[in-house]
C-alpha cells in the first residue's frame, strides 16, 4: 500500500494513457485496491477514452452512488466488474471484512439502467465453494453480461491465509459439473468464465498471458510491473513512469526482460510442447513455492516439486483468518 501523496497525479495518468495508446494498447483496466478512492476518477476515465482506450473498472461498489455512476458513464466508462464474496449476507460480509453485500445487491439494478457492460466477479475458496450452485442462480436473477468465477490465487494476503482458504478435493470435484451445466444453460444469455484452481491442476496457467507479452501493471506510485505480484521476486528493478517513457519500459526495462521469451527456461520447459501455451507458468508462484523464480512452476506435473502441492491441498478448517493491520 502506498501513501496517497506518493500517487501519480491526474496529469501523470493522462500522459501514461496517451503513451499506452501510441504503443497499441487497447484496454485500460482500473483496479485496486479500490478505484473509487480516487476523487479524480471521472477525469481518469475521460483521459483513457480520449486516448482511445476501452475503459473497464473493477470495484467493490462501496461508495458508488447513482450520481457518481452517472458521472463515470458520462466520462466514458464502458465496462464495470462488481465483486461478490458469497451468496449469504453474513458470510459475504465476514469474508469482505465490511458490510458490503446489501450495497452490492442494491447497486445491480442501478447499473442495469446505464449503457454499460456488466460483469459479476466471484472469487471462490473453501469458505464459499459449497454455495456455488446457489450463487450462479442468484447471478441469473441479476442478469449480468458476464459471470466470472475464479478460484482464489495464493498471493499476498491469500497466501498468508492459504490453510483457511484452500478448498478440499471433494469441493473442487463437485464444483466442476456445476460450472459445466451452468455454461450450457446460460449459453447466449450470460457468458460464464471459470478459472480452475492452480494447486489442483497438472499444468500451469499462462500467467498474465506470458511475462512481458501482453500485460503491464502501473501501480499508484507509477512503478511498472509485468504482473500484480512481481514485487515478491527478489532482485527485480521496476522502472517508474515518472522517469521513463512507457514504450521504453516495455521494450527495455530489466524487469520486463527477465522472463520474456524462453532463454531463462530449464531444459524441461525449453523442450516442452506446451511452452507456447503456458510460457513456463507463473514465476511468482514458482518463487513462493520453491524459493527459485527460475524453477518449473510446481503446478506442472513435470516439476520435481509437483508433489508439494498435494501436501498444500490439505485444508485446515480450524485455521483463523489473518487480517491486515
Positions of the model-derived regions?
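Flexible, active-site-proximal loop/turn residues at the rims of small-molecule/cofactor binding pockets
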Residues: 34, 63, 86, 153, ...
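Short, conserved clusters of charged catalytic residues that mark active-site
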Residues: 11-15, 64-67, 103, 241, ...
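Gly/Ser/Thr-rich beta-alpha loop segments that engage phosphate groups in nucleotides
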Residues: 34-35, 63, 158, 214, ...
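Short strand-loop junctions, especially beta-strand C-caps/beta-turns
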Residues: 33, 123-125, 287
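Exposed loop/turn and edge beta-strand positions of beta-sandwich/beta-sheet ligand-binding modules
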Residues: 26, 212, 268
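Radical SAM enzyme [4Fe-4S]-AdoMet core and its adjacent flexible, acidic
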Residues: 3, 8, 54, 70, ...
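Flexible mid-to-C-terminal extensions adjoining Fe-S/redox cofactors in radical SAM and related proteins
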Residues: 231-325
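Conserved alpha-helical substructure of the radical SAM core
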Residues: 1-79
Amino acid at each position: 500500500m502506498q501513501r496517497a501523496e506518493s500517487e501519480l497525479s491526474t496529469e501523470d495518468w493522462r500522459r501514461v494513457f496517451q503513451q499506452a495508446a501510441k504503443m497499441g494498447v487497447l484496454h485500460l483496466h482500473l483496479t485496486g485496491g479500490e478505484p473509487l478512492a480516487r476523487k479524480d476518477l471521472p477525469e481518469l476515465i475521460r483521459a483513457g477514452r480520449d486516448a482511445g482506450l476501452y475503459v473497464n473498472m473493477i470495484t467493490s461498489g462501496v461508495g458508488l452512488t447513482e450520481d457518481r455512476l452517472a458521472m463515470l458513464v458520462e466520462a466514458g466508462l464502458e465496462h464495470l466488474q462488481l465483486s461478490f464474496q458469497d451468496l449469504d449476507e453474513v458470510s459475504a460480509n465476514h469474508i469482505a471484512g465490511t458490510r458490503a453485500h446489501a450495497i452490492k445487491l442494491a447497486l445491480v439494478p442501478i447499473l442495469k439502467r446505464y449503457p454499460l457492460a456488466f460483469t459479476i466477479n466471484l472469487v471462490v475458496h473453501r469458505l464459499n465453494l459449497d454455495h456455488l450452485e446457489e450463487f450462479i442462480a442468484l447471478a441469473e436473477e441479476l442478469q449480468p453480461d458476464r459471470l466470472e468465477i475464479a478460484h482464489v490465487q495464493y498471493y499476498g494476503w491469500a497466501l498468508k491465509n492459504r490453510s483457511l482458504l484452500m478448498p478440499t478435493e471433494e469441493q473442487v470435484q463437485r464444483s466442476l459439473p456445476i460450472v459445466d451445466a451452468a455454461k450450457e444453460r446460460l449459453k447466449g444469455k450470460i457468458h460464464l468464465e471459470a478459472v480452475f484452481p492452480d494447486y489442483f491442476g497438472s499444468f500451469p496457467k499462462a500467467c498474465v498471458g506470458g511475462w512481458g507479452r501482453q500485460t503491464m501493471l502501473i501501480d499508484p506510485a507509477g512503478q511498472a510491473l509485468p504482473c500484480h505480484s512481481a514485487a515478491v521476486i527478489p532482485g527485480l528493478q521496476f522502472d517508474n513512469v515518472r522517469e521513463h517513457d512507457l514504450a521504453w519500459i516495455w521494450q527495455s526495462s530489466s524487469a520486463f526482460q527477465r522472463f520474456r521469451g524462453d532463454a531463462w527456461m530449464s531444459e524441461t520447459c525449453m523442450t516442452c510442447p506446451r511452452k507456447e501455451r503456458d510460457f513456463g507458468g507463473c514465476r511468482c508462484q514458482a518463487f513462493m513455492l520453491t524459493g527459485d523464480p527460475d524453477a518449473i512452476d510446481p503446478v506442472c506435473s513435470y516439476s520435481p516439486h509437483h508433489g508439494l502441492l498435494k501436501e498444500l491441498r490439505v485444508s485446515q478448517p480450524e485455521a483463523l483468518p489473518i487480517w491486515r493491520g
